[in-house]
């Protein structure tokens, strides 16, 4: 199953439909997660793997990725040899939706136990983040505290996904109407959501300084 998921590129129409950063995303009830896994194997060389997941059998794409993490990142937890050095990985996700609250909490918990894994998440749209005190907003703040870099996708990110994950048959990526405006709007919204996190960090710093 893993080989199948890793080898299949997204159809063009499916990518455009699910990743379109429209304000009213009707009918987009699944999360698509395109990923890149990198590991440094030398001063000037890295291993590189990529693929995509989507929700399957009530399992969210984020949790599905974690389920296959051992196969995607061999040596992440070591090989059972005493005193061995665990391998470090850098993972980038490009998600059609930002993670739900439960996935965010579980991811943050997992990352706290896996310091040799670095995760960046690019999102096309924000999931259930309109309400000020929503659990989804709190989940994103928790991910940030866990060291995850969360960013709203811009034109260059959509272009990269088109080049990397889509069966495009040499066709060029064409920006849809209001791609840039929606990206800027969502980026500002995400910044406001994550702002309390930065305020708390400042408070902690002031406490350490005795101010």
Predicted regions and their residues:
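Zinc-dependent deaminase catalytic domain
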Residues: 1-211
């Amino acid at each position: 199953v893993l080989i199948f998921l890793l080898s299949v590129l997204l159809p063009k129409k499916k990518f455009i439909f699910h990743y379109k950063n429209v304000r009213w995303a009707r009918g987009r009830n699944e999360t698509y997660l395109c990923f890149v896994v990198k590991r440094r194997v030398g001063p000037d060389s890295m291993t590189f793997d990529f693929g995509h997941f989507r929700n399957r059998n009530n399992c969210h794409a984020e949790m599905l990725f974690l389920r296959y993490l051992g196969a995607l990142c061999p040596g992440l937890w070591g090989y059972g040899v005493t005193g061995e050095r665990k391998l470090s990985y850098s993972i980038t996700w490009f998600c059609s939706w930002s993670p739900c609250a439960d996935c965010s909490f579980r991811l943050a918990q997992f990352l706290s136990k896996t310091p040799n894994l670095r995760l960046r998440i690019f999102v096309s749209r924000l999931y259930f983040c309109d309400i000020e005190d929503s659990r989804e907003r709190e989940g994103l703040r928790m991910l940030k505290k866990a060291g995850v870099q969360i960013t709203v996708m811009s034109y260059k990110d959509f272009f990269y996904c088109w080049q990397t994950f889509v069966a495009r048959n040499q066709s060029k990526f064409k920006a849809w109407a209001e791609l840039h405006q929606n990206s800027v709007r969502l980026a500002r919204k995400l910044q406001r959501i994550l702002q309390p996190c930065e305020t708390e960090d400042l408070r902690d710093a002031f406490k350490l300084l005795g101010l």
